């Protein structure tokens, strides 16, 4: 993108720059932020760590917390650090609580991002009581900081984390979340949320494959590529449930092909789960960070039941001898 190219050029030329160092640090931040959205996450993380390491001998400010919040977000999406992440987030919260009273200009967005990641991390670990406490905390914090969009993020992210527990409740939270995504700045979230709504409706038997496909088309038309390709995985699951293996395989292949989907650990997990059923052959997937979670139970089920001819949506409250598909396809 133009922003990415511009930031890279500015960073390269920074050795000749004699102005305030803060400006160069901000350029680095925007470069790393651009890398995150172009699926170059390791490069991005290196820059975010570089930014935060510069604050060992100086007061922490907005840039520090913004970079730390991005590190927290990347750790969550790495799909490999759930067990250590709550302690890391608590360190962030301690630093914030010390600095905030002294710096009224501190932006709340990074703090709200960190507390949101606490909630979804506990959902990933199946620590539902703690997740519910953080749901309520995040609602209060979003109201306190007058951040309507973060109310939407809270409701949507909570909903996605309970697909394997209560699809009906998840749908209510998704529909509530979408009410907060009606402003132009939240258009991507609105279309993403609409896609999740149609997917959950299908799983509940109240929606249709056609409505989910229309939601995917809207993502395509707006060039929201990651969400668009992830919807192929949703469609693959839906076609499996309909008994249409050929269509399911076609959508799996569409999701696996793009470069942007190659280095994502969560995508790897989902593709292995779907592919094992469609190929009737266990595709190896190992992630020690998931031990003891519902994700791990689903992985074990795929290895035991890969020869099953039918599949069901995994529900943590029920046991099924059929092949279990994780509904958390996002």
Short names for language-model regions:
Residues 31, 71-75, 118, 151, ...:
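Structural register within alpha-helical repeat arrays
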Residues 93, 105-120, 124, 128-130, ...:
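Solenoidal tandem-repeat scaffolds enriched in leucines and small polar residues
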Residues 224, 250-330:
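C-terminal non-catalytic interaction modules
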